[in-house]
Amino acid sequence: QDISRLSPGSVISAIQMRVAMEDGILVPWKKNRAEDTKTAWELLATDRGGLYLDSKPGVYSDVIELDFASLFPSIIATRNISPETLNCACCQATTSYPDVECFVPLDPEGANLTFRERARKDIFASKIFPSSNQSALQVPGLKTHTCARTHGFLGRVVAPLIKRRMELKGLKKKKGDVYDLQQNALKWLLVTCFGYTGYKNARFGRIEAHEAICAWARDILLTTIR
């Protein structure tokens, strides 16, 4: 009853706080982390949105529409983007473009297994001497990388929602049925989770995470176009 009367932002904040309490993470009363300083050139390179292309006027046939399922939330989970994973002191990203194996599995259980396996191999250096690691993903076009050792908090929030939404879409029989309505509600929660990374008052927001998500989205779309 309470959830049905809350905004998507309030719901996603409640989910984040629940996961934080389950994992023993301190929940800030109010956000008190200022945005990192940037030069004018850095701001020009990072403070960008998604990718928009103007279509060429004309009449076309055999047109194909390509849609991504939960693109931005999937980027959060598979690229391990979270406030605490950005530019960690223990990892140094490689300059080469990462293989698919370097991404975190979207399935929550598979993601947990991946990080347990990385910890078992003990391939990480100390925070004083960071080591080059292929799993520490370099954000395309930015001077930012994500940690290969720590499983990001935001990824652990969105991955179960993505999985549940995919299950509901598989059960949908027609547009507007109960399963369609439920998956659509989860869709807006996932969209809000992305937006909250750049919201100045979000407890677990960080503008650098928002910029990293947008950078990966632009890279994926440009790769698809090519």
Model-flagged regions — what are they?
Residues 1-83, 89-90, 180-219:
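Common nucleic-acid-contacting/processivity interface regions adjacent to the catalytic cores
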Residues 68-71, 77, 81-82, 90-226:
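Conserved catalytic core of nucleic-acid polymerases
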